[in-house]
């Protein structure tokens, strides 16, 4: 049965049915295509193939309702847009701008996994710019301000992925929190004579603030502090 929180977010949905039933539960037309392994053909109920060819992203149903059901759909829209080089529909754009704050209703643990999907790819900088443009970034990284360092780091990550080189979320989160950590360190150092203690305290405070939005595994926070 479908269960929702007071905010309208769907917290449980284990209703199963036909393809026709399933398709209306999908988020975007381009993400609602089915393949018949016997007939070797694509089944398209909502015009997903047409949208793929036109490089457009339309939501299934009413955007305002669908985003309130699952706010993560907003950042999925951004990711699909950058990955496919597709344009968001006017309805999707408008509703993301209006409902960006709903992302705060999502559990920090789930947002950690979503952040990896957002930034560990060849189009991560484009994703970053779009998240900022639509007011979503601050609901993932409220301590992070746009700067050239992040741009260089994301472009470097993209280049490594293209070259089939390994990437790590340690580097990703350290970069996003670097400026906030440095600013906090400067403030603490005015009162704390020990460089090491000031650096450690600044790192811990910034990470504590971050995990309120996006959970970070303990092994990850330890390595972020090392960086």
Briefly describe each language-model feature range:
Residues 1-227:
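Catalytic cores of the polymerase beta-like nucleotidyltransferase superfamily
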């Amino acid at each position: 049965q479908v269960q929702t929180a007071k905010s309208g977010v769907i917290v449980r949905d284990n209703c199963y049915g036909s393809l026709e039933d399933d398709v209306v539960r999908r988020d975007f037309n381009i993400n609602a295509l089915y393949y018949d392994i016997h007939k070797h053909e694509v089944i398209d109920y909502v015009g997903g193939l047409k949208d793929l060819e036109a490089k457009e992203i339309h939501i299934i149903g009413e955007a305002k309702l669908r985003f309130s059901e699952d706010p993560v759909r907003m950042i999925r829209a951004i990711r699909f847009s950058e990955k496919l080089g597709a344009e968001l529909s006017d309805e999707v754009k408008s509703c993301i701008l209006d409902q960006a704050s709903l992302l705060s209703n999502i559990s920090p643990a789930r947002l950690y996994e979503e952040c990896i999907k957002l930034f560990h790819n060849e189009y991560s900088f484009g994703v970053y710019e779009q998240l900022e443009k639509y007011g979503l970034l601050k609901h993932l990284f409220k301590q992070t301000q746009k700067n050239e360092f992040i741009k260089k780091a994301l472009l470097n990550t993209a280049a490594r992925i293209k070259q089939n080189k390994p990437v790590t979320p340690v580097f990703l989160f350290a970069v996003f929190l670097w400026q906030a950590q440095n600013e906090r360190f400067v403030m603490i150092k005015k009162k704390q004579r020990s460089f090491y203690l000031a650096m450690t305290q600044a790192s811990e405070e910034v990470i504590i603030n971050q995990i309120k939005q996006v959970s970070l595994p303990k092994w990850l926070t330890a390595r972020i502090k090392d960086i």
